[in-house]
Amino acid sequence: MAGQKIRIRLKAYDHEVIDSSARKIVETVTRTGARVAGPVPLPTEKNVYCVIRSPHKDKDSREHFEMRTHKRLIDIIDPTPRTVDSLMRLDLPAGVDIEIKL
């Protein structure tokens, strides 16, 4: 698999969970002999929802809720077959979304 690159993109609502997952991935990849670039923190996506507090009156009283999506990017340069196998076996928390591009 010489000359190839694997790009892993992680998304999660909790920054501690995504950082620990990125640490696990980097640790696993370096143990198998491939080079790693990252984790690179990408901009946090912030969605704000505005809701009227009362069900039928008082439009001036509103409540704001926000949802933050944290993202990280990890590049694996020159992966070995052992690297790919160990990444497939890696256990990560349920709150982390993973996209892998070859």
Swiss-Prot record:
Span of the signal peptide: none
Short name of one Pfam family: Ribosomal_S10
One cellular-component annotation, GO: ribonucleoprotein complex
Assigned keywords, A-Z: Ribonucleoprotein, Ribosomal protein
Gene3D superfamilies recorded: Ribosomal protein S10 domain (3.30.70.600)
Highest taxon in the source lineage: Bacteria
Biological process according to GO: translation
Any one GO molecular-function label of the UniProt entry: structural constituent of ribosome
Keyword Ribonucleoprotein: yes
Stated family: Belongs to the universal ribosomal protein uS10 family.
HAMAP family xrefs: Ribosomal_uS10
PANTHER family the UniProt entry points to: 30S RIBOSOMAL PROTEIN S10 FAMILY MEMBER
Role, per record: Involved in the binding of tRNA to the ribosomes.
Subunit comment: Part of the 30S ribosomal subunit.
Protein name, UniProt field: Small ribosomal subunit protein uS10
Gene name of the encoded protein: rpsJ
